[in-house]
A protein has these predicted regions:
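Short hydrophobic/Thr-rich beta-strand motif most characteristic of the beta2 strand and flanking loop
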Residues: 54-61, 69-70
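Short amphipathic alpha-helix used as the core "switch/output" element in two-component signaling
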Residues: 68, 103-116
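Alpha4 helix (beta4-alpha4-beta5 surface) of REC/receiver domains from two-component response regulators
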Residues: 104, 126-146, 150, 154-157
Length: 161
């Protein structure tokens, strides 16, 4: 998919229009968006959009990398007498990734008391009712199709407290 996207869609077509995504994303001070996607194209688009939304973020390349980073952020928060919600505003994850997929990442987050209340948005090129049902079954707070910046911005705003 990655190679096809790069062939059929020049990189300048993947520019995020600030007018379409809207105003700054309001995150709690000191928090970030933790994002996971193995696709270079998708990571680039997510980074562009989060920059336009003025949202601090950390980007990872797999569910496992995101899970490890999330646990490290939680440990750092706990060492300061805080919770992970003082460090991470939400997790944005792809579904199909090496090492750990987005379903497993989401399930791990939602089943852990340590991450209670942490919103998870699944951002995927996979569609269809079976995937959307599975997204709900693992407890994701939102689902949005890839490559539509304004839909992602709207979904992030909807799930943020």
């Amino acid at each position: 998919v990655e190679a096809i996207l790069q062939m059929v869609s020049p990189s300048d077509e993947h520019q995020v229009d600030p007018q379409k995504v809207g105003a700054k994303l309001l995150l709690r001070p000191g928090t970030i968006v933790l994002a996971a996607d193995d696709s270079f194209v998708a990571r680039s688009l997510i980074e562009q959009e989060l920059k336009v939304l003025q949202a601090p973020y950390e980007m990872t390349k797999s569910g496992k990398e995101a899970w490890d980073r999330l646990n490290a952020l939680a440990a750092a928060a706990e060492a300061e007498g805080k919770t992970v919600l003082d460090k991470v505003a939400l997790v944005l994850t792809d579904l199909e990734m090496p090492e750990m997929d987005g379903f497993t990442l989401t399930r791990n987050i939602k089943q852990s008391a340590r991450f209670s209340g942490l919103p998870v948005v699944i951002h995927s090129s996979l569609s269809g009712s079976a995937n959307e049902d599975h997204v709900r079954s693992v407890g994701a707070d939102g689902y949005v199709a890839k490559f539509v910046a304004e839909d992602l911005a709207q979904t992030l705003r909807q799930v943020l407290p």
